Regions:
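Bacterial Sec-dependent N-terminal signal peptides
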Residues: 1-28, 314-316
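Outer-envelope beta-barrel architecture signal
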Residues: 25-31, 66-70, 114-118, 174-184, ...
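N-terminal ordered "arm"
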Residues: 26-69
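Transmembrane beta-strand segments that form the barrel wall of outer-membrane beta-barrel proteins
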Residues: 31-41, 178-188, 262, 288-294
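Outer membrane beta-barrel transmembrane domains
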Residues: 41, 82-83, 206-317
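Membrane-embedded beta-strand positions in outer-membrane beta-barrel channels/transporters
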Residues: 52-54, 101-103, 159-163, 196-200, ...
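Outer-membrane pore/translocation modules
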Residues: 76-103, 107-217, 222-225, 247-265, ...
Length: 317
């Protein structure tokens, strides 16, 4: 009888332990920081899209028959000419601009094997975004001199933007070594109006199957309300993209007033190539990528420019 009680209690503890270990995989929330900077790819260049900082919180919905993820984000983006110190307007080949915004996003995954993400963004473009202060702070950290030329920046304008992203995997099942997913993004508003389409290629560096697109760090979808068989992830990804732009207020200025000291016309067709490495294990997501993009205006001499992106995220139960 004692042996029976021992084995009974041992079995219960074992079952409970297994249950708890699987329950720990149901991470429902995530906080993260994304940092863009051209210094992540070169210690020499400091120009054009020179810095972006994004802080976010996202969580998985309760009591939903389909997977839904909500996100709140605060972001700041900074743009400068080729030379951060421009004493004369003739030296400005791309307007100085700063954009500060808050954004809400809603992502859901359909049983019909596609995902849809919608977003609403409110912000301010211009001196009120405090980009000059932010750049001087970054320069102080890196030991660079303070910048001049922000008196030529895009004037203040209110930002309201809506976004829609459609995700579609090429396959319904997980592939072991490589898979492909297409995304199409529409941005419509006073700051950016453009349409982009791309293809993500994931190349697995583990021997296990890739997580599905609806449960992967690449698509910001690895949050769940119930325990899953989610595995750690380590993969290389490549994303070629083509787009068509109708409006870019960081270059053209406001849609409603023409008081910016320097503005340029934009190139309608835009191209981009991103490649990098992503790693996700238990509570942590880490990634590094390089983004090469075509010039947004013909005033810029260089046809291709580059910046790097670093992401750090932490999951909560």
């Amino acid at each position: 009888l004692k042996k029976l009680k021992y084995y009974t209690f041992s079995s219960l503890f074992l079952i409970l332990g297994v249950h708890l270990s699987f329950s720990q995989k149901a991470f429902t929330k995530e906080v993260g920081l994304i940092s863009d900077n051209d210094l992540y790819t070169s210690s020499y260049y400091d120009r054009y899209y020179t810095n972006g900082t994004f802080l976010y919180f996202r969580y998985a919905s309760k009591n939903s028959s389909v997977k839904k993820i909500h996100e709140f984000q605060i972001g700041h983006m900074m743009y400068t000419p080729q030379f951060a110190n421009s004493f004369f307007p003739e030296a400005v080949d791309r307007p100085y601009a700063g954009y500060l915004f808050a954004k809400y996003s809603h992502l859901f995954f359909s049983p019909k094997n596609y995902g849809l993400k919608s977003s609403l963004e409110l912000g301010v473009l211009g001196p009120d975004a405090r980009a000059e202060d932010m750049q001087n702070l970054i320069h102080q950290i890196y030991g660079f001199n303070p910048t001049t030329g922000w008196n030529y920046q895009i004037s203040n304008t209110f930002g309201i933007n809506m976004g829609l992203v459609f995700l579609k995997p090429f396959s319904k099942t997980s592939k072991k070594r490589m898979d492909f997913t297409s995304t199409t993004t529409l941005k419509l508003g006073t700051i950016f109006t453009e349409l982009n389409t791309n293809i993500y290629a994931r190349i697995n560096l583990f021997s296990t199957l890739l997580n599905t697109y609806s449960n992967s760090t690449l698509f910001e979808s690895n949050l769940n309300r119930i325990a899953t068989s989610q595995k750690k992830e380590l993969f290389i990804f490549i994303k070629p993209q083509i787009g068509y732009a109708l409006h870019n207020a960081t270059i053209q200025g406001s849609l409603f007033k023409y008081d910016s000291p320097i503005t340029f016309g934009i190139n309608s067709f835009i191209y981009e190539l991103e490649f990098g490495l992503k790693y996700a294990i238990k509570r942590f997501d880490l990634s590094y990528s390089v983004i090469k993009y075509s010039r947004k205006t013909d005033a810029i001499e260089e046809k291709i420019n580059t910046y790097g992106q670093i992401k750090i995220a932490y999951k909560l139960n």
